[in-house]
């Protein structure tokens, strides 16, 4: 069976380099292209060398249309504007689009979902097995505990992360909201500062920390009368996200058009 040919978007970034390494270690995939923003100083550089590997002959380019002609999928952990630009091309080419980009707006998500009648999209705020299991647990716990338990989500990432709360924190927040039977946007408390007044009943709170090289720490706190339940996950290496994204791509290869998440990839939808 031939290997799945994958493009890495943002191949010169930290996550992009991790994806290149994951593909190099895979028996089921090979690197078909390395995408960077047009005008980047990295254009023309060898993707393997940038990832700390031997040269592989794949040069970074800003031309997704050309490199996608012989590809089967694209792994996209970039920025919202780049991901939205990539969505149209991936759909036109009929290749699987694995999206781990965070900071997307509701309108961005609507654009992504609009192509899924004719394209394959797997999207998740976090591609790791552990976090997706955590999300399933959070939903079940939120459903099981009554409103006397307040829900707070604490996350920490490295100092270079540009969006907050993290995509993973929001994913966990949505899981908690779903368990409670509410809409997160209507029950979200962020950035408390100064005299805020008492905590509003039913809110799901978020707090974000930034510093050092933390790959991603997340805790969901259920604070009730005289007791607290804390569900946590610590990412020690961003390679867990790269391997998860690669697993998603291989799973999506040959699937019918549609919108999928890591719960589909990992078979978690019927866990509880």
Curated annotation (Swiss-Prot):
Keywords: Amino-acid biosynthesis, Cytoplasm, Diaminopimelate biosynthesis, Lysine biosynthesis, NAD, NADP, Oxidoreductase. Gene3D superfamilies: Dihydrodipicolinate Reductase, domain 2 (3.30.360.10), NAD(P)-binding Rossmann-like Domain (3.40.50.720). The keyword Heme does not apply. It is found in: Cytoplasm. The keyword Amino-acid biosynthesis applies. NAD(+) binds at residues 10-15, 36, 100-102, 124-127. Catalyzes the conversion of 4-hydroxy-tetrahydrodipicolinate (HTPA) to tetrahydrodipicolinate. The active site is at residues 157, 161. GO terms for molecular function: 4-hydroxy-tetrahydrodipicolinate reductase; NAD binding; NADP binding; oxidoreductase activity, acting on CH or CH2 groups, NAD or NADP as acceptor. HAMAP family: DapB. It catalyses: (S)-2,3,4,5-tetrahydrodipicolinate + NAD(+) + H2O = (2S,4S)-4-hydroxy-2,3,4,5-tetrahydrodipicolinate + NADH + H(+); (S)-2,3,4,5-tetrahydrodipicolinate + NADP(+) + H2O = (2S,4S)-4-hydroxy-2,3,4,5-tetrahydrodipicolinate + NADPH + H(+). GO terms for cellular component: cytosol. (S)-2,3,4,5-tetrahydrodipicolinate binds at residues 158, 167-168. It comes from the Bacteria. Belongs to the DapB family. It comes from Bradyrhizobium sp. (strain BTAi1 / ATCC BAA-1182). One of its GO terms (biological process) is lysine biosynthetic process via diaminopimelate. Pathway: Amino-acid biosynthesis; L-lysine biosynthesis via DAP pathway; (S)-tetrahydrodipicolinate from L-aspartate: step 4/4. The gene is dapB. Its main location: cytoplasm. This is 4-hydroxy-tetrahydrodipicolinate reductase. Its EC number is 1.17.1.8.
